[in-house]
Amino acid sequence: MNSKRMFSTPVFKFSFLILIIFLSIFLLINLQACESGQRVIKIGNQSVLSGEYRSFGEDQLVSVELAASKLSPVRIGGFDYEIEVVTKDDEGNPEKAFLVAQEMVDEGVAGVIGSTFDGTTIASVPVYDESGIPIISPSAQDPEISGTGDVFFRMVINNEQKVENIADFIINEINPQKIILINNQEEYSKGLVDYLREVLSDNGIETLQPMSIKINEEDAGIIAENLLIEGPDTIFYCATYNEVAALISRVKEIGLETNFITETMGMDENIFVLADAQYLEGLIAVIPEPPSLADYSQDPKAVSFWYDFNNYLNQLDEQDISIEGPGTYAPYSYDSVFVIIEAMKKSNSILPQDYIDELRTISFDGIVGHIEFDSIGDRIGPLSTVFVVKDGAWVRY
């Protein structure tokens, strides 16, 4: 049969047309699959993953990866994206952190969660600021970081805000007539007490001359006697729980009736081993965590997160992960990813220059509470939780 006549028959033309249609559909489907597979949002995870503080970084790593797994794929601007977590260890070293930030920029991350510490965050922010890439720290608390660039945001309460919350409690709940502030001679404690005194003074509450002490069993009695002479109706002591136990025991033994307040370092279950329950009764601790996350929380979102975190962690058993459960900053890391993605969705873009304005005006209810940022990237109104010793146990105030 003549081949030219065969190719020109109606049957052949129809068959060839059907073949072309099927091939076109096949290629279109595969092209779309390839395109969707290539649409990726890179989220940087910069933290300390080596050395003695690696647990902080592992906490962040698991939380960020868990959030990415919950959100992927995410639809933004009419396209579906997978979230790829780009993790780098800055070793908790500011010099290394600066280099890691540059590497993150080179890899094209659209946003960054990190860094773990104040120093590493301070070193990293200028790099991200120059490239216009938002960075959200779940754990760095130095207030001086705020406003160092237009791209820095902070998920956790900062050191000034935590003191302001302590002052707010003292002013509105205690209303002391004669208060003394005591530090334990450590840098953190001295800074906290100094700022607390300033905030109280600004609100019309003058304090007695602050005390700076390094307490031991021998000195505790002498210090207590000096306090008895001063006669304060309220004592705020920024110190570890064993130091708090030693001082409050002597103060109560000599009969000084006073409100006794501490903060995070002073709240620990082991304090009941070191002091008689009668002396600890009424001891107050103001903790820089929202009620949803603080000890004994039954908040559904928090409980669900802790459950999901542990399940995800169990899937990583073969990896070199040392932590056994979520730490303090895990929820802040988790919510940081959600907030970035929420800003992208609102802007219909994964580009930093497009979504950063939505991030600045975000209003989001996360595990850590309601999330909004002020003009310098700090959380607006982050909450603290107050505990009191009642019948030999810590309970919500």
Where are the predicted features?
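Beta-alpha junction/loop-to-helix N-cap segments that form part of ligand/metal-binding clefts
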Residues: 35-36, 40, 55-62, 74-146, ...
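Extracytoplasmic "Venus flytrap"
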Residues: 44-65, 88-94, 117, 185-190, ...
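An alpha-beta-alpha
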Residues: 49, 152-215, 233-234
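Hydrophobic alpha-helical segments within soluble ligand-binding/sensing domains
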Residues: 97, 155-179, 190-191, 218-221, ...
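Periplasmic-binding protein-like
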Residues: 104-116, 136-138, 178-183, 231-241, ...
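Extracellular/periplasmic bilobed ligand-binding domains
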Residues: 126-130, 193-291
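Extracellular/periplasmic periplasmic-binding protein-like sensory domains
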Residues: 248-334, 388-396
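Segments of small-molecule ligand-sensing domains
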Residues: 315-396
